[in-house]
Amino acid sequence: MVLLYTPPQKINKLQREMEVEILDLDYQGLGVAKIQGKTWFVENALPGEKVRIKIKEEKRQFGLATTKKILEASAQRQTPKCQYASRCGGCQNQHIPVEMQREAKQKALFRRLLKLQPEGIEFMPMIVGEAFGYRRRVRLSMLFDGKLKRLEIGFRQKNSAQIVHIEQCEVIEPALNKILSKLTALLSRFSQPKNLGHIELVAADNGVAMLLRYSGKLTENDRTLLLDFAVREELMLFLQDDEKTEQIYGQPPFYQLADNLQLQFDIRDFIQVNSLLNQRMITAALDWLDVQKQDHVLDLFCGMGNFTLPLSRRVKSAVGIEGISAMVEKAKANAERNQCQNVQFYRADLDQNFADEVWATEPFNKILLDPPRTGAAFALNALCRLKAEKILYVSCNPATLVRDAEILLNSDYRVKKVAMIDMFPHTGHLESITLFEKQS
């Protein structure tokens, strides 16, 4: 019998706990340290601080750790405004001044693009808004504690399934906090609170919409409690069981954009959660594309027309492409509602070959795309053949932005402008817009 030699596993010589100095801040709000030549990312640590860390995970090129004790605190460290910040899994970075958060995000974005294109990029001022009270949508988990006979409403604890019960959230709009503060008293009166799933609140421009998700069937008494609450608080009320979602009170929610545009949506639909920055982002996009009356513009991953309809007010024709059929129908309805007659919407899977689609052969001279976190690699490889003079890319993931930018650079496009958008202060999310121009 042949015995195979198995070398012993390499023993990690690093201590599980150690003292380190934090050298920098990454865009997700993690402190950066060097240990034995390797980069480590440390939770709850600021540049200039000395901290005792606990190793969480070590990988080949980097490691992850958490701060166990702050030995020397930075003068810039601040007390979180939110009383739940140390436990809630929502905002991770309230201990960091918002200006420092933004600078770290902007630096990371610019540095990544400079590696691809060292010259010729115009770095635009960051697009920012309010640091608190900016979210117009919130989703709340619910759990009934049978032993304590108590209903918990709030957010999942960080790295846990436990719920942090909250009465107020510092990053949501005031109109949502007004409703949030009354939910525990309302829902604790339900006959079967253990059947409650979650609640979504959305601050539309015509009032607050509320969705209650539950299993089983609501009793007439529980339904009456909800309806009375909706009438009293002037809510648009939606109920969702295991089979369907229905609106039982109020008008359909909508949000407004410039040029008297009004976009109607369902409470489950994706909309940008930061209303102010959504408008500023649209304004910047149209300005950078330098849209003119003779332009033919293609908008990919268009949703219900968030960019397409504002574009249609300024160009000869606009075409929006979306992968979800229901969103395409809502986009068409919004176009009709706003009397936008020079816009068309189509359903297409942009991760599949769309060369034979009727819209794919039109002579678009400008393109806008707002893809999901996975990016738009397949679509861009096909779109480069259209040879549009300008392409504006809205990104929510710097890694896929860089990957997709390389596709465009290899097709004779160059990065013209870029700006960081601080859509989600106190989180590690990095949004941006980048303008690419075709080289003549």
UniProtKB/Swiss-Prot annotation:
Binding residues for S-adenosyl-L-methionine: Q272, F301, N306, E322, D349, D370
Amino-acid positions noted as binding [4Fe-4S] cluster in the UniProt annotation, renumbered to this chain: C82, C88, C91, C169
- The TRAM domain is annotated at 8-69
Q: Where is the active site?
A: C396 (nucleophile)
Give the E.C. number(s): 2.1.1.190
CDD domains per UniProt? AdoMet_MTases
Alphabetically ordered keywords of this record: 4Fe-4S, Iron, Iron-sulfur, Metal-binding, Methyltransferase, rRNA processing, S-adenosyl-L-methionine, Transferase
Q: What class of enzyme is it?
A: transferase
Example GO BP: rRNA base methylation
Q: Which NCBIfam families match?
A: PRK13168.1, rumA
Role according to the record: Catalyzes the formation of 5-methyl-uridine at position 1939 (m5U1939) in 23S rRNA.
The protein here is known as 23S rRNA (uracil(1939)-C(5))-methyltransferase RlmD
